[in-house]
């Protein structure tokens, strides 16, 4: 194998696939990154057997070939190089990769590429290599920037507790004209739905995707060409899902990335049953102001289980003008009281929330104003952007019960 590429492009590709490298594994090859030079592209690949990522970058290939090298060493070395051309050559007999960039030279011991697990691909139509597995299934196209926003607004609500694997996933439902995502950790629920430009499925398809997989996809999409859709493939057995993303032109960019993920084999809870059907108090407040007030309150709430009391009250005479007051108390640090003007309909109410949960959802709302709907201090509250219906974006958060 003899191949050349730009340092910026290789660094970008390694940063993308590197997050899929197995942190701890009994298989040494899973701690490596695969480099495969072919068709004037350099494919980088990594997997932990749950998530697999392929990334293709532009390259000049003189001799085709492949090798796997330690991920951490390769990434740190490439990031230390100047932004110039990198020449790589493989000594097949010793499985050693020689790298040269400007006046920097290195030799890295690797493992045979044939030992590396095969990562499924969406395919380009000309695959003849027996080492390539083209994933078959239902193909769906999604608008790139809209998909990233959906992921950001939902995946944070998933659980990180591996003892509850079902809640570590995001339920993704493909309908003929609609895409819906939902995630919950048992204390909060985030549901986001969007219209599809054209139907890709005749019957609904619902799968449970690990939140970590969607999080990685969101990071990849941040550098993607938003003019091209993300292609999604769901296998007929509903055990794998693949996302294909196209990159931008220029230095420090990739040609395309494919993320393949195992699906969670479990039934997601019926979250619709916990969504409040009515409310007694409706509060409309400036999103940025509320987010800032919660962050200030959290400074005092950190020593008290992050509890922030939220009191809403309508204006004099029952008019819509009113206020929202946030209170946080620490036995050792003191207390904080923050007041904001708000449009309040209904009765006075005080309810306590986890400040972190409020910050998480408010940070993902772009709209200028947000709606908080509540019934009583012991019942869940709902948060959504003003102007978006409950069938578009809805966040439900359970109240806390601070000691009196």
Q: Model-derived features: where do they sit?
A:
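Structural preference for solvent-exposed beta-strand-turn elements
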Residues: 1-404
